[in-house]
């Protein structure tokens, strides 16, 4: 399981707390099976808790909420992901500058 999928699902749960797994899968363009697998892992880690919609006729629907440790994990994953993307950006920028310099010779 990738940190990126975990971060994307944690972010989605923050942005759309009432979303079900199908909606998450559709919004993130990943398989329903992947969403189910990641959410189960997040629950096992204690980052997400599950509840029912108490004021809904759809008692079988679940609501996924980030726990305090889930919020902390989201912050850590976001920092890690930003650092990774920053390094990728710098590497691509250096590569582009090198190609441009070669083209000017």
Language-model features, listed with the residues they occupy:
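Alpha-helical residues within the helix-turn-helix
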Residues: 26, 43-44
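Amphipathic alpha-helical dimerization/coiled-coil segments
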Residues: 73-105
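Key DNA-contact positions within bacterial/archaeal DNA-binding proteins
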Residues: 22, 33
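Short, cationic-aromatic polyanion-contact patches
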Residues: 1-5, 20, 51-74
């Amino acid at each position: 399981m990738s940190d990126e999928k975990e971060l994307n699902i944690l972010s989605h749960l923050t942005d759309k707390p009432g979303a079900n797994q199908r909606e998450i899968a559709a919004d993130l363009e990943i398989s329903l099976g992947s969403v189910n697998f990641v959410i189960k892992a997040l629950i096992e880690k204690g980052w997400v808790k599950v509840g029912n919609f108490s004021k809904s006729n759809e008692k079988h629907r679940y609501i996924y909420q980030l726990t305090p440790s889930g919020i902390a994990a989201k912050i850590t994953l976001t920092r890690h992901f930003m650092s990774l993307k920053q390094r990728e950006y710098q590497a691509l920028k250096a590569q582009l500058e090198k190609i441009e310099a070669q083209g000017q010779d």
